[in-house]
Amino acid sequence: MLLGSHVSMSGKKMLEGSAIEAHEYGETTFMIYTGAPQNTRRKSIEDLNITKGHEVMEKYGLSNIVVHAPYIINIANTTKPETFNLGVDFLQQEIERTQAIGAKDIVLHPGAHVGAGVDAGINKIIEGLNEVLTNDNNVRIALETMAGKGTEIGRSFEELARIIDGVHNNERLSVCFDTCHTHDAGYNVKEDFDGVLNEFDKIIGVDRIKVVHVNDSKNDRGAQKDRHENIGFGYIGFDALNYIVHHDSFKDIPKILETPYVGEDKKNKKPPYKLEIEMLKQQQFDPELKNKVMQQ
């Protein structure tokens, strides 16, 4: 089963360090940012330590890794040309890094229309993706299902479908299905996941889903908040998330945890991924998980 989490990529070890961290959590795949998600400072491809990273991945059976584009990219912005242009240029660079790392998909938040309206935002995203996807490689951009916070685009399957339909080279577009986001956007992920998936299949096609973000939610369905919770401790619950992780439709695609670190003290938070992954593999909820994470 391809199950992993977001891991860090930093220091001198870069991809090698990411692979070691993922292995320590008992993962078979993982997701990384190529640098800080809040800025454009990036190391050169030569400094990403890719060869050693691949050696560690092969040693420990890690594959199908995923890259996440930084949050600062907003190609839905119609009011500031510099924001749009930065997004297009930087996304192209990130795709080059993604290809060098050997990942097939780079996850992208479609963007926010910042008050110009959904139609204007979608048209701008299409314009940006048409520009970006002229470059010659086989990396897919995985558009993420969004919670609908603020002016986010991608809160409904229909919005994502409109983007995909408008992009010329759309065989290079995939979808990242985020459980927390779709729940927060109003879809009944908890009680009727197969119904949600059938709806997705009719509107977009389930074969477009190439990444799943597995997150519980701190909020009730339809809250449009996007606040992740640890597996089984939120409003979606363990049974629904366990069902999704083991779903036949997602058998061969990476399932990535982005659940929050545990701990009241901001300086002493600990990653939950090792124990959350064990829990999902055993298909048994552990109500003591958070306490056990802090005792690690």
Swiss-Prot record:
Gene3D superfamilies registered for this protein in UniProt: Divalent-metal-dependent TIM barrel enzymes
Phenotype reported upon loss of the gene: No visible phenotype. Double cshB-nfo mutants are as cold-sensitive as the single cshB mutant.
Enzyme class: hydrolase
Signal peptide positions (record): none
Keyword Nuclease appears in the UniProt entry: yes
Residues engaged in binding Zn(2+) 1: 68, 109, 144
Family to which this protein belongs: Belongs to the AP endonuclease 2 family.
Record protein name field: Probable endonuclease 4
Primary gene name: nfo
